[in-house]
Amino acid sequence: MSELENFHAISLPSRCLPYDGVKPEDITARSYLGRDEIYLAEITPDNLDQKFLQIMKGAIRGIDPEQMTLGDREYFILWEYIRSYSDHLGFELVCLNCGKQIEIQVDLRELNVIELPENFKQPYSIPLPSGIDVQLRLLTIKDEIDANEFAQKSNEALIFRCARSVVEAGSIVDKMERLKSLPASDVATIRAFHEHFYHGPNMNTKFKCPKCGAEDDIEVPFRFEFIFPRGEALTRAFGKRIRP
């Protein structure tokens, strides 16, 4: 292993609570290498799940990337961007106080991280509005890949995702049929479970307008450039290193 392939400890926002037999202290990751850029350049919104999984398999150790939660993946994407490309993100917006177009720089290292509560445990039992209890788990990268493949041939991907998170005996088809017969409020509650236990980078931060000095809150957009910077994002990150 070369010096560039040194693996470093990474603290996942899930605290590894959803993973059986996985210890947080055993999770390590490395920054991207040149060979990773070959595959990163091929990633599009349509193939992100499959392509980025291949990158993760070589860049993270101590866990099977397919079994990682979507929140942990989002955190890992930002972790890699900070270590491999830039710890700052610049973008333009309109100040709501003075109405001027401004450019701000956000230090990505200062973003807060939302973690799963220490008492989180899977499967997680919740009562549905109809009165029945259901056991749920968080969705994984493998679930998302399967859901996207399912969406290519069916318009029931939403129900598919919900069914994958239900922990009970029976096939995925049986679970989907059961969910389709439940009240909409029950299905919405299952969806709310995943929103409630979001974990990953908190993209909300504060900024100060350079024109008028007003402070405001902003949600930093989780952009596709976090996967592979190009164009203006690439120039902002590395353009100053190139002498005229």
Predicted features, each with a name:
Residues 1-244:
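Long C-terminal interaction/binding lobes of large macromolecular proteins
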